[in-house]
Structure formats: C-alpha cells, structure tokens
Curated annotation (Swiss-Prot):
It comes from Neisseria gonorrhoeae (strain ATCC 700825 / FA 1090). The keyword Lipid biosynthesis applies. Transmembrane segments: none annotated. HAMAP family: LpxA. It is found in: Cytoplasm. It is an enzyme of class 2 (transferase). Coiled coil: none annotated. Belongs to the transferase hexapeptide repeat family. LpxA subfamily. This is Acyl-[acyl-carrier-protein]--UDP-N-acetylglucosamine O-acyltransferase. It comes from the Bacteria. Homotrimer. One of its GO terms (biological process) is lipid A biosynthetic process. The gene is lpxA.
C-alpha cells in the first residue's frame, strides 16, 4: 500500500509502485518513476527523468534529478537512474546526466550515501559502496563496487576509482585510484592496500598477498609504468582477484595516483 503525506506535491504523471512512502512536503516531478517499497522522507525533491528502484530509503532534504551544474546544459531529457536497496541520507544531491557525457547519471544497488554528498552529471557508481559525509564527485567520475570514500573526499572530473579502493578523510583525488588501493592527501597519493576491506569481503590471505605484490610492482620496485602494467595484466590472466585490473587499465584516461 502506497502512503503519501497529504502535504506532499506529486505530479499526476509520476509513477509510484506499491509500498512507496512519501513524507511531508516532498515534491516529485512528472517524469519520475519510483519502485516498490521505497521510502522518501519529508522535504525531499525528486525531479527530471529520474528512475528509482525498489527498497531504497531517501532521507529529508535530498535533491535528486535536478539539472546538472554545467553551463552547456540546454534542458535536454537526460536521466538519473538509481538501483535498489540504497540509503541516501540528508541533503544529498544527485544531478542528471548531459548529452556531452553518457546522457545519464547511474547509481547501482546497496550503496550507503551519507549526508551532504554530491554526485555530479554523468557519474557512474557501482554497488555496495560507502560515501562518508560530504564526499563529492565531479562530472564523469566512475566509482567501482565496494569502494569506500572518506568524509570530504573530492574526486576530479573523469577520474576512475577501482573496485574495493578506499580514500582517507579529505582526500583530493585528481588521478585514477587502482582497485584495492588506498589513497590519501590533498593531492591524493597511494597509501597502501585496503587489506581490511578485502578481508571483510571474503578475500583469502593468498589473494591479499597477490594484490600486495601488484602494489609493490607499481610503486616500490622502480619499474617503468608500462612494464609494470604489462606484468600485472599477464598475471591477471590466471589470477581471478587481479582480473579487475584489466578493465581498470583499459578504461583509465587520467593516469593513476603516484
């Protein structure tokens, strides 16, 4: 059963599945679709061509699907797509995509987005991530699965953060962060392996050791980057835990943190 507070303003063209709850003074626009059992708190605003999946919890004052902060945007019907089972806390802002990007901003499943986080246009966020308070992504950023962003992390346009990576408090990410690695600092630098995150997600000691050797190959052995990359890609053909480096290196355009 859908429960809508009488003060909520919902366009008649919006589509709300069964079990959706909408709090007081929330505003939902005409091109919004919301999946079953999603709960939206008071004073939220959901606009644009926005599709939200099932079993999400969206807290008060979230702003989802507003136009991108891009001067080139001309009211094109770009999209925001949010998956299932996400927690989106207070004062978060997720913008629509742009026609000069991929045309949509996408968030996967089971993500935990804390208060005041910002996802700009054309960002792609995977599954099972954690964004601590005030983490912000500039446009066209890609974040992999199981990533943890420390509070006040800022990620520059077009950067890529690999699966299981982690950033420290107030990290300024201006280059790509490889999978499994930690990054810290105003101009983020490599800060070791996210070994605790790997253990919590079921990686064996042998697998963690293999990734640690990749870290040493990239940063501690004095090997030129292209040679180190080729060596890692060779190992990735036979070691499953290293397979994520294949896509990461193929898609990386800004170079990696050094």
């Amino acid at each position: 059963m859908t429960l809508i507070h009488p003060t909520a303003v919902i366009d008649p063209k919006a589509e709300l599945d069964s079990g959706v709850k909408v709090g007081a003074y929330t505003v939902i626009g005409p091109n919004v679709r919301i999946g079953a059992n999603t709960e939206i708190g008071p004073h939220a605003v959901i606009n644009g061509h926005t599709t939200i999946g099932e079993n999400n919890r969206i807290f008060q004052f979230a702003s989802l699907g507003e136009i991108p902060q891009d001067k080139k945007y001309r009211d094109e019907p770009t999209k925001l797509i949010i998956g299932n089972g996400n927690t989106i806390r207070e004062f978060t802002t997720f913008n629509l995509g742009t026609v000069t990007g991929i045309g949509e901003t996408r968030i996967g499943d089971d993500n935990w987005i804390m208060a005041y986080c910002h996802l700009a246009h054309d960002c792609v966020v995977g599954n099972h991530t954690i964004f601590a308070n005030n983490a912000s992504l500039a446009g066209h950023v890609t974040v992999g699965d199981y990533v943890v962003l420390g509070g006040y992390t800022l990620v520059f346009q077009f950067c890529r953060i690999g699966d299981y990576a982690m950033t420290a408090f107030a990290a300024g990410v201006h280059k790509d962060v490889p999978p499994y690695f930690m990054a810290s600092g105003y101009r983020a630098e490599p800060a070791g392996l996210n070994s605790e995150g790997m253990r919590r997600n079921g990686f064996t000691a042998e697998q963690i050791s293999a990734v640690k050797d990749v870290y040493k190959t990239l940063y501690h052995r004095g090997i030129p980057f292209e040679e180190a990359k080729a060596d890692i890609l060779r190992r990735a053909e036979t070691q499953a835990e290293l397979a994520v480096f294949q896509d990461f290196f193929a898609q990386s355009t800004r170079g990696i943190i050094r």
